[in-house]
Amino acid sequence: SAASLADMVAGTRRGLLLTCLWYIREVDPETLLLTGLTRDGVYLVENGEVVAEVDHNFRFNHSPLDIVRQATEVGATERTLPREWKDWFTRVAMPPMRVPELNMSSVSPSR
């Protein structure tokens, strides 16, 4: 069976846990390049434990196809919560993924 998110965190030596992606926009429809931001949900993981909230948001520029190709682990599919409570239509089911080389293009303070 697929790993839970907790199992995946427990198996992480050092990394970032991203729990919310926001303001996702299309950059190049031919390659499906998207840009977006992390928001209110970036955590530092060290030695299998979430040790701190990261006080920054990050911008990414990636194709979801490339992200799936780069994933080294995919966990059990879970129903996600909407960013805003009134956004009931944006609920989806998605698995957590480990993507070791996911690069962020810029950083900004989260507050």
Please report, for each region that a protein language model flagged, where it lies by residue.
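Dual-mode signal for accessory low-complexity, basic/Gly-rich regions
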Residues: 1-111
